A protein has these predicted regions:
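Flexible, gly/pro- and Lys/Arg-enriched active-site loops
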Residues: 76, 81-102
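Short acidic active-site motifs
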Residues: 54-58
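A generic structural motif
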Residues: 39-45
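Extreme N-terminal starter segment of soluble prokaryotic enzymes
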Residues: 1-4
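Short catalytic helix/loop segments, enriched in acidic residues and glycine
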Residues: 20-38
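Short acidic/histidine-rich motifs immediately flanking catalytic phosphotransfer sites
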Residues: 62-69
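Short beta->alpha junction loops
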Residues: 45-53
Length: 102
């Protein structure tokens, strides 16, 4: 199974940006924990972009390349019609996560 993890804007700053709110765990720390949990059960790929268009393209390109997409769209969660449309249009199952529920 191949799982594509997509991370949206400013998640590259985890551990640095407002640690009193978001903590000191970095995106690399989270990626390492996910890899540890997956062990040999899944092929994991992580991508992060501050660009909405890149996230849309990665969702569109996931067909035939990933079995599932896991996305933390960050600030785009509440504002991006383009991401919503891309998720609705893809054949690949998409799971939306947030820092507050992982």
């Amino acid at each position: 199974m191949k799982i594509l993890f997509l991370n949206g804007p400013n998640l590259n700053l985890l551990g640095q940006r407002q640690p009193e709110i978001y903590g000191t765990t970095t995106l690399a720390d989270i990626e390492g924990a996910v890899r540890d949990q997956a062990e040999d059960r899944a092929d994991i790929e992580f991508r992060q972009s501050n660009d909405e268009g890149a996230l849309v393209t990665w969702i569109q390109d996931a067909v035939g390349q990933a079995d599932v997409v896991v996305i933390n769209a960050a600030g785009y969660t509440h504002t991006s019609v383009a991401l919503r449309d891309a998720i609705s249009a893809t054949e690949v199952p998409v799971v939306e996560i947030h820092l507050s529920n992982i």
